[in-house]
């Protein structure tokens, strides 16, 4: 097997091959309240990671992330994918955390569910949170994880 460069790659490789997603507690001592979801395969690593998943895989990925977030923080959850320019790990991952109050900015895209979450095409990140029965998706930013409790 090819040697991979980051700790998240190694974490994914420790898991059974049949698991499509891996949940890990963020190992940073500065982020004690954060979790991460990673696709187990390395096929999504690198630039434009979500574009490398099929629509069905992406919907399942987002459903799993939202399920974990709701289990941890009820309706106060947020998900954040940092953009290509600021991502510090090569293995694709999304931050799962408690959404900070008062961070809603601009005009988010409002979607009905995980299957409708768009794929950033320009290397930017996105962050997502619930709004009633729908989701607010914020696009066009690089550093998105700052909307989550550390």
Language-model regions: role of each:
Residues 1-150:
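HIT superfamily nucleotide-processing domains
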